[in-house]
Amino acid sequence: MFATKDPEFENRINTNKSPRNAATCRGRYEKQAKGEFLMSDMLAVEQETNNDVRQFLNKINELRNKAPKNEETKHEEHTPDNHEETDHHEAKQQEQAWRGNLRYLDTLNRLDEVLPRKLYERWEKEHTVNDEAVLRALCYFAGTGKNSQLGWCRVGRGTIDKRARLSKNTVKKCLDRLVNHFKLVERTEGYIPGSAERECNEYQLLFKPYNMK
């Protein structure tokens, strides 16, 4: 239909080595030269455009989510309700009690300042090294572990034996003296569910840490 041929079109046809590809290219370029486009070609171009737009929008949303929020938005989102304030207050109280709990070990060197005079005099005159070792073990367990709180612990006698580094019979006698004679510890018989130890009693120290007397 055209008087002259497109040089670029002829050049592409000549450089194509496959006769089949050459025929295909000839038909496509002839349609382009005539301004004719297949419907499938138009749909393919439109689909590619839509994909590009979708990817661009996804990228924008991703960057928007990563962007830091302003202070007003942060304040609105993180404003604690009454329940959260109560939980925070309880956690703070537990933390303070836990810190005071750890000072029981230091209090052993200042029993004269936390015990009544007569009770301290009895302790000074009659206690043995083993009594002090068992009391020190109870002070340790009253400040560490999941089964403890301020001045209280629930622990098996076998665990006390290992901490005090004494025999079972010696620990038993010392515990009886601390409870019945010196009146420094209160004992409640019990057990810990799931524990391998048969005897897991509760022990309450009957004196406060030095800093909380």
From Swiss-Prot:
Renumbered to this chain, region (Disordered) spans: 1-21, 63-98
Q: What is this protein called?
A: Uncharacterized protein YffL
Biased composition of type Polar residues is found at: 12-21
Tell me the organism.
Escherichia coli (strain K12)
Ranges of Basic and acidic residues composition bias in the record:
1-11, 63-93
